Amino acid sequence: METLSYSQIKKRKADFDEDISKRARQLPVGEQLPLSRLLQYSDKQQLFTILLQCVEKHPDLARDIRGILPAPSMDTCVETLRKLLINLNDSFPYGGDKRGDYAFNRIREKYMAVLHALNDMVPCYLPPYSTCFEKNITFLDAATNVVHELPEFHNPNHNVYKSQAYYELTGAWLVVLRQLEDRPVVPLLPLEELEEHNKTSQNRMEEALNYLKQLQKNEPLVHERSHTFQQTNPQNNFHRHTNSMNIGNDNGMGWHSMHQYI
């Protein structure tokens, strides 16, 4: 076995170092953060804005995103409406006439935010998209209570928005109630609740109330039909529902017309 002297080892090391120095050094290049990191450090509002901009530029993305994102629960929708209503009430100026033009101009943006939210959410609880009568009624009841709490003003022009909301709620009510015409099992009709809604709205929901009264008048026929159905399907039970309802125009699509007002 060959034994290397110190001088030989030193020479070999020098030759090796010389080879390294002749190699092309790969230097780093500046670049932005990876997309995953950018998303991690972006706040929710930024991501929301970016997503909407991408959908506007690439409409096909909307279908894919709808297929991925889960629909919000009813509780979430109602909570959103309540928060918007709180923001509206908190935006009133301190002191002064809260029914005057100045007050309306101060709260107008928050007022419209409530209407826009209703405009987006109500159709999600109407057939044919939503066919569950009880769920539809529950949401419409909550939405009606929100409209009841919208402020009114001395200037009748400022009250057009609320009147239109009642009109649309009435139509949605009619659409949901008409689901019962073909149902073999009919839930308990919430007549008292709708009467209270109509009273609070100053008879602006009378059309839906009259329709519900007509349903109640035909209730013996309905129950006879239901009894026959139960005899052939004994496992089915009557659905009991004590909540209320409301919203829309004759064909249930009236919320689309809200855009001309807001």
From Swiss-Prot:
Location(s) in or outside the cell: Nucleus envelope
GO cellular component, one term: nucleus
Keywords: Nucleus, Ubl conjugation
Main location, first listed in the record: nucleus
Gene3D superfamilies, sorted: Tethering factor for nuclear proteasome Cut8/Sts1
Superkingdom of this protein's organism: Eukaryota
One GO term of the biological process aspect: proteasome localization
Family: Belongs to the cut8/STS1 family.
Subunit text: Binds the proteasome.
Descriptive protein name: Tethering factor for nuclear proteasome cut8
Taxonomic source organism: Schizosaccharomyces pombe (strain 972 / ATCC 24843) (Fission yeast)
Gene behind this protein: cut8
